[in-house]
From Swiss-Prot:
PROSITE patterns, per database record: ZINC_FINGER_C2H2_1, ZINC_FINGER_C2H2_2
Protein name per Swiss-Prot or TrEMBL: Zinc finger protein WIP5
Biological processes per GO annotation: primary root development; regulation of DNA-templated transcription
Keywords, alphabetical: Metal-binding, Nucleus, Repeat, Transcription, Transcription regulation, Zinc, Zinc-finger
Similarity comment: Belongs to the WIP C2H2-type zinc-finger protein family.
GO molecular function terms noted in the UniProt entry: DNA-binding transcription factor activity; zinc ion binding
Span of the annotated motif Nuclear localization signal: 254-257, 297-300
GO cellular component terms listed in the entry, alphabetical order: nucleus
Pfam name, any one: zf-C2H2_STOP2_3rd
Zinc finger intervals, C2H2-type: 178-200, 225-257, 262-284, 288-313
Organism: Arabidopsis thaliana
Main location: nucleus
Amino acid sequence: MSNPACSNLFNNGCDHNSFNYSTSLSYIYNSHGSYYYSNTTNPNYINHTHTTSTSPNSPPLREALPLLSLSPIRHQEQQDQHYFMDTHQISSSNFLDDPLVTVDLHLGLPNYGVGESIRSNIAPDATTDEQDQDHDRGVEVTVESHLDDDDDHHGDLHRGHHYWIPTPSQILIGPTQFTCPLCFKTFNRYNNMQMHMWGHGSQYRKGPESLRGTQPTGMLRLPCFCCAPGCKNNIDHPRAKPLKDFRTLQTHYKRKHGSKPFACRMCGKAFAVKGDWRTHEKNCGKLWYCSCGSDFKHKRSLKDHVKAFGNGHVPCGIDSFGGDHEDYYDAASDIEQ
């Protein structure tokens, strides 16, 4: 029969070792080939460290180290990278789903070229009444404003001055067409139309006041550039200079760029301006002589010669090809009438 005291002691010890002995075992392998067993218990218990020495002939088994790709740091970086890629894709898809937005970028300095024009239906110098009348007649005028002060090759135009570049039809026909309300004949000048109206009856005669037209005088006084390319009076020419006014431009355009319907019946020379043709036929075939023996085809050339040499040089007379010269001139006068 056992001793009750010993039995109680044994049972208490077993219970203590069975239920209250909670351990946490960790294995640590050092470089000397020893395993350390660390038993972590409550503060009331004992930690046991057991050192096992292995013989050199039988090295201990070594566990394979985990791959670096499975390390927590690398795994976290991969997760962050995947999250960034997913976020970028979502933002890109949202941008594509949004309606397109157009942005105008104005890069560079503003270009204030000479070719920039201010299109208007009237001249800036015209009065209000003239502007209304020009608009009613449908006059289309291109008014250019010179903006570059540093350009020396554009004549005497400066900032704030205006000029006009008429079209070929405006040059040849005229900027304004006045129409007779009875026969619908057109005239370039208001005075000519009024005189034509007098022929329809005395009821259209209203005295001298009826001849005072309302032409766009402000527009006709503007300096004009020629519209023909390559002309020295074209605005794109390196040394372009504007012509004084519209009438001067008309004569220039007819002489330099227009057709020449008038031909001299003495020599066959063609002219674009009727006045030039009349003057030429009047003097064609004539020779002007100087007292020094020089002859000239033009009277103005003889005058320049006498003025240049002075004493001893005086006009002597005029010679012509034949007596039929006056007949040619008379015939030309009859045609003009």
